[in-house]
Regions:
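N-terminal helical capping/dimerization or prosegment-like subdomains
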Residues: 2-96
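Hydrophobic, small-residue-rich alpha-helical packing segments that form membrane-like cores
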Residues: 129, 155, 159-161
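Active-site metal-coordination/substrate-binding segment of hydrolases
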Residues: 79-152
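Short, solvent-exposed coil/turn elements at secondary-structure transition points
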Residues: 65-67, 112, 159
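Short catalytic-loop micro-motif centered on adjacent basic/acidic residues
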Residues: 60-61, 152-155
Length: 161
């Protein structure tokens, strides 16, 4: 069994690249409740599918009555299987005047206590969580060559509806 420390070290070493990938995802204004943003919801699904395919997942985009679902599999027979669920859609940004910076231009911010956070629509609900799981898979595969168990990832685009 692999020690976790090398995987965590790889995550730390690749932090700038991981943040760039997250920021690219956060820049997609995938507002599912506004039909005007349907193309951007599809863009988010396509971006995710490409990211997961590049990591070696068997990936598909599945149509629904609202926005596409991304389903990715990395089977590993004879091992436990993990299912990860998340969503790529975000809430509307109104009222826009309450944002200090454009909501789809993510940035790092430091608060008065010195804590660094990511500011941008979707950073905590739910694109940040989705990318945390994807980056963990990326780091594990970088260190071990394959995931330790079977993994299925389901990411939908209508949770905020």
């Amino acid at each position: 069994m692999t020690a976790l420390a090398p995987v965590l070290n790889d995550i730390d070493r690749d932090l700038d690249n991981a943040l760039e990938r997250l920021f690219a995802f956060l820049r997609i204004p995938s507002i599912s409740t506004d039909p005007a943003f349907a193309p951007q919801c599809r863009d988010a699904a396509t971006w995710l599918a490409g990211t997961l395919t590049a990591l070696g997942f068997e990936t598909g985009i599945h149509e629904t009555s609202l926005h596409p679902v991304v389903l990715a599999h990395a089977p590993k027979p004879g091992t436990p299987h993990v299912l990860f669920y998340g969503h790529y859609d975000v809430q509307p940004v109104d009222p826009l005047n309450l944002w200090e910076t454009p909501p789809f231009e993510p940035r790092l911010a430091t608060d008065a206590a010195g804590k660094t956070t990511i500011v941008g629509r979707g950073a905590s609900d739910d694109k940040g969580q989705v990318m945390t799981f994807i980056e963990a898979c990326r780091a594990w595969k970088a260190m071990e060559g394959e995931l330790p168990c079977g993994v299925t990832i389901l990411i939908e685009g209508a949770e905020e509806n």
